[in-house]
Amino acid sequence: MSQSTPTSISAKELHSWLNNQSKQPICVDVREEQELALAALPWKVLHLPLSQSSSWMGTLSQSLPINQPIVVICHAGIRSFNFGTWLLEQNMGYQVWNLEGGIDAWSVEVDPSIPRY
């Protein structure tokens, strides 16, 4: 059965994934530029701000490989959930997770050096 909504992943689970060489996800950050300036993640992410979707929509399939888990991130987990759901609706075979609570949860549960906003 195919996935219809993103699977939730906690900040602690994602931290574990990022430290496990065998399960390296592609992290897609859908926050806006000004949000990245406030709180940047300490690892490589694919930045796809939702307000600029017209600029990256046509190349999305080249940016996201089918064979790697995709974790979508935003501030609180709502925009990322919506984007992850849309991504799954494209029926391209992606495996999509949503960071529960977004970067705010990451700051609270994993890395307090990431500013909360």
List each model region and its residues.
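Rhodanese-like catalytic fold shared by cysteine-dependent sulfurtransferases
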Residues: 1-25, 33-69, 78-117
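Short, surface-exposed ligand- or partner-binding patches at beta-edge/loop junctions that are enriched
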Residues: 73
